[in-house]
């Protein structure tokens, strides 16, 4: 949408810009309450060269004009490589009215940078009427300050998404979805749809800590076929969505339970062994999903938009990393090693693919609990949870931790203190350091570990990854470096930023006659729920 104040020639008036329309959508989401159980949900994406971007940043703020705020509509920013390079180089950033630079929205990579720089010259020559100039680093600080304060906007990278897409022959990808793992093109005739499934990694880890690779391969291939069947039997009420589903047959296989299996294997989340395991598992799942889609194409035919796609040229997700490096002009810091025979698969996919996309790693925040494992790629947020069900509220302790402490004969002696300390084991010297390293929680891990895990997986994933970030720091300059590293490592998207609370509730123990404080080291604690432990009188 054109910027606020942009002239509307047909009516001799001025546009109100995109913000009021976003408010309308926000109100509609509130109206769709699903019997009061859950409000509707949607996400608005904006490129940060839009003249009204500063107002977009304020949408989720608590203060200010309520008519210019959204309470249900999530927000995300679509960032170009041109902007990131200007942040790194300390250069200015120009904001334009889309009415005067109408083609920018459809461009990406080198084509975007070239055209954007041409518009800068036109603006400086007085040939563009409405524009603003801000230091690129200043705008990046504003984005990250808003992210810290409100959790929005999520950061996504337009060029990594489009340049690495194998299905971009049908148009530019302009946005992701509510969880930032789906990257599909759409237009007025096509509403993008994707059919998702998440594999529970824990189900393929044997009791002797070896992997059942054969069973995992069979499950991936079965899931690919089941999702493809689902496309044909699903009743899609919106014609544009049905058309997109039929023309692209997009799938999104992902997985959950990473932290769960790392604990069972006694591997620290921030170790090279963990990064290599993510690399190996994601490559394996990607290989068998792509191969099975090629098999389906031979049986049932390719998806209608196959011709002209990256698949039709024999390209695979790993092949697009070099393309991103070339267009960006900056090497993408991704290790391109592989373990499987991808060359044979390159020749196979040229002949046909049943599905435009195969992989997307979702957050699985809810279904992972049903499956009894950890969500997506995320580490453990806490070792103790308060879980609410229809039968009431109860505590749940990480079963892997309990099992390990019992093996060390420490559970009975430490369980009360662990409950009082919200499950944080880092301050307990009785527990070996190697065990404490394995059971670090979200805010105790390096943020660069989150980036490394996502980067290792992203090189094999043709769509994107829902990557939550957890930070204890409130230093925006540190945020700039962390998110710049995510860009350098080739991440396509990030999701919520969780910042450790400044304050935590005081913990107490209860006796029959008195209440006394529990000594805790706040520097070694993690956020979570408050608990009390009962002493025997």
Residue ranges and their predicted role:
Residues 58-59, 66-67, 71-150, 320, ...:
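Polar, glycine-rich mid-to-C-terminal structural blocks
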Residues 37, 219-242, 246, 268-364, ...:
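Internal maturation/activation junctions in enzymes
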Residues 70, 74, 78-84, 89, ...:
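Phosphate/diphosphate-binding loops
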Residues 1-5, 44-53, 76-78, 99-107, ...:
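A glycine-rich phosphate-binding loop feature that marks nucleotide/adenosyl-phosphate handling sites
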Residues 32-44, 63-70, 94, 125-133, ...:
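Inter-helical turn/loop segments and adjacent helix faces that build the functional surface
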Residues 180-185, 227-232, 334-339, 347-518, ...:
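Catalytic alpha/beta core of large soluble enzyme barrels
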Residues 6-13, 52-61, 68, 107-108, ...:
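Short acidic, glycine/serine/threonine-rich loops at helix termini
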Residues 1-10, 14, 18-21, 31-35, ...:
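Function-dense linear segments that define catalytic or interfacial modules
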């Amino acid at each position: 949408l054109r910027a606020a104040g942009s002239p509307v020639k047909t009516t001799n008036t001025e546009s109100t810009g995109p913000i009021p329309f976003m408010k309308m959508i926000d109100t509609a989401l509130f109206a769709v309450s699903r019997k009061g159980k859950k409000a509707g949900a949607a996400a608005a994406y904006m490129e940060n060269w839009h003249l009204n971007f500063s107002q977009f940043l304020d949408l989720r703020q608590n203060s200010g004009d309520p008519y210019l705020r959204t309470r249900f509509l999530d927000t995300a920013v679509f960032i170009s490589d041109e902007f990131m390079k200007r942040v790194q180089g300390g250069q200015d950033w120009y904001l334009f009215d889309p009415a005067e630079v109408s083609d920018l929205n459809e461009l990406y990579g080198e084509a975007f940078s070239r055209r954007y720089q041409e518009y800068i010259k036109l603006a400086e020559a007085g040939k563009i009427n409405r524009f603003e100039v801000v230091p690129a680093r200043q705008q990046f600080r504003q984005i990250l300050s808003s992210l810290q304060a409100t959790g929005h906007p999520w950061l996504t990278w337009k060029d990594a998404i489009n340049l690495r897409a194998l299905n971009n022959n049908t148009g530019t990808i302009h946005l992701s979805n509510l969880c930032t793992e789906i990257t599909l093109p759409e237009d007025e005739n096509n509403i993008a749809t994707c059919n998702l499934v998440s594999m529970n990694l824990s189900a393929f880890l044997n009791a002797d800590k070896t992997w059942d690779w054969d069973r995992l391969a069979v499950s991936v291939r079965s899931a690919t076929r089941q999702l493809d069947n689902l496309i044909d039997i699903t009743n899609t009420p919106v014609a544009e969505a049905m058309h997109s589903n039929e023309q692209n047959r997009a799938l999104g296989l992902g997985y959950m339970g990473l932290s769960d299996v790392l604990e069972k294997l006694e591997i620290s989340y921030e170790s090279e062994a963990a990064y290599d395991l993510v690399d190996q598992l994601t490559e394996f799942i990607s290989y068998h999903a792509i191969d099975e889609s090629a098999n389906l194409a031979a049986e049932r035919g390719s998806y209608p938009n196959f011709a002209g796609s990256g698949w039709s040229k024999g390209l695979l997700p790993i092949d697009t990393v070099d393309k991103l490096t070339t267009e960006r002009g900056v090497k993408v810091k991704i290790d391109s090693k592989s373990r499987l025979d991808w060359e044979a698969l390159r020749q196979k996919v040229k002949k046909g693919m049943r599905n435009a996309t195969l992989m997307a790693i979702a957050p699985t925040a809810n279904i992972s609990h049903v499956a009894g494992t950890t969500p997506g790629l995320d580490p453990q947020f806490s070792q103790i949870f308060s879980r609410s069900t229809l039968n009431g509220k109860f505590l749940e302790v990480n079963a892997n931790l309990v099992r390990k402490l019992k093996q060390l004969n420490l559970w009975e002696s430490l369980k009360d203190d662990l409950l009082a300390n919200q499950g944080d084991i880092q301050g307990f010297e009785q527990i070996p350091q190697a065990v404490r390293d394995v059971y670090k929680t979200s805010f105790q891990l390096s943020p660069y570990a989150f980036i490394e895990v996502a980067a290792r997986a992203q090189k094999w994933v043709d769509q994107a990854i829902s990557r939550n970030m957890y930070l204890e720091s409130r230093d925006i300059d540190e945020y700039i470096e962390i998110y710049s590293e995510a860009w350098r490592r080739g991440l396509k998207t990030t999701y919520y930023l969780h910042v450790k609370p400044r304050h935590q509730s005081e913990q107490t123990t209860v006796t029959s006659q008195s209440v006394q404080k529990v000594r805790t080291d706040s520097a070694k604690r993690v956020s979570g729920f408050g608990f009390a432990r009962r002493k025997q009188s």
